[in-house]
Amino acid sequence: MINLRGVKMFDKLEEVVARYDELNKMLVSPEVLADSKKMIECNKAINEITEIVEKYKEYKKYVDDIEFIKESFKTEKDSDMKEMLNEELKEAEEKLPKLEEELKILLLPKDKNDDKNVIVEIRGGAGGDEAALFAADLFRMYSRYAERKKWKIEIIEKQDGELNGLKEIAFTIIGLGAYSRLKFESGVHRVQRVPKTEASGRIHTSTATVAVLPEVEDIQEVTVDPKDLKIDTYRSGGAGGQHVNMTDSAVRITHLPTGIVVQCQDERSQLKNREKAMKHLLTKLYEMEQEKQRSEVESERRLQVGTGDRAEKIRTYNFPDGRITDHRIKLTVHQLEAFLDGDIDEMIDALITFHQAELLSASEQ
């Protein structure tokens, strides 16, 4: 058997296996069986480490196979059998480095927000009407991505621009793991294209800012003094017509200490608008605190792919060349039309992989 003792990673893996066994014993104990809350917590804890345990078992199986093959080789006389054993040994030894890397990634500290829903804010930046059109394109892109994932979208607030553009929009994406997939989308997105209104065919550059915030699920995650809130109600706006709300159902909440303002007029009920606006406010306050903590960690590690800097130009969408380039990881993908239709998993997977590699590098220093 290959000696794994003294290697920090494998000591940690043995701890995880011991914890896994302990949790499974707890799960069938009378105390846990009689308490549904404890049972849920226990199952959740087991699910969080099951993949690590299974991957580690697979790793140890290959280690045992290698030892068995080497021992068999010592006593084997038949040349054909020796050749076959050599092939099996080579195959098993090639598996180990890949499994080790997978185990290292699985042992990285989990982002406690990864399973949460997200609130996404998109604002048109430099470029006037063209920036508003681009903001609308990004909203459609994330909406289509959510559809592909079978996630649900709820609008919180929206300000329309000219030509079917969006000055800004805030919306919730409801789905397990939404934050884990979308957290690297925060930043400045840039578009290069010829506007429909441009007679000379000159390429314009416009921007839109995206912020992805983990939604606050538990009100206890953020403490807010009611005295710090200014709540206004007003009549919902809109494009006019039969759906204009003639009552003061829209809600605007101002958090006086920070100056953060949120509003919601999407629902017909003032109570529902207030609930949505309050959740948006709590999420923004939670994100402020998270960003403060992140900036300390990420500045120490000098991570290239972060989740907090909204001023960072992260990506360019070039229409003439039909390409999208993420500047943080220097990755260019093509098929721009499909990308804007929500086919963005290739980019997201690359960002996650790059971030994991950076975390691994930082943890080994």
From Swiss-Prot:
GO terms for molecular function: translation release factor activity, codon specific. Methylated by PrmC. Methylation increases the termination efficiency of RF1. The modification N5-methylglutamine is found at residue 242. Pfam families: PCRF, RF-1. GO terms for cellular component: cytoplasm. Its main location: cytoplasm. Keywords: Cytoplasm, Methylation, Protein biosynthesis. It is found in: Cytoplasm. Disulfide bonds: none annotated. InterPro entries: PCRF (IPR005139), Pep_chain_release_fac_I (IPR000352), Pep_chain_release_fac_I_sf (IPR045853), Prokaryotic/Mito_RF (IPR050057), RF-1 (IPR004373). The keyword Cytoplasm applies. Belongs to the prokaryotic/mitochondrial release factor family. Peptide chain release factor 1 directs the termination of translation in response to the peptide chain termination codons UAG and UAA. This is Peptide chain release factor 1. It comes from Fusobacterium nucleatum subsp. nucleatum (strain ATCC 25586 / DSM 15643 / BCRC 10681 / CIP 101130 / JCM 8532 / KCTC 2640 / LMG 13131 / VPI 4355). The lineage of its organism: Bacteria, Fusobacteriati, Fusobacteriota, Fusobacteriia, Fusobacteriales.
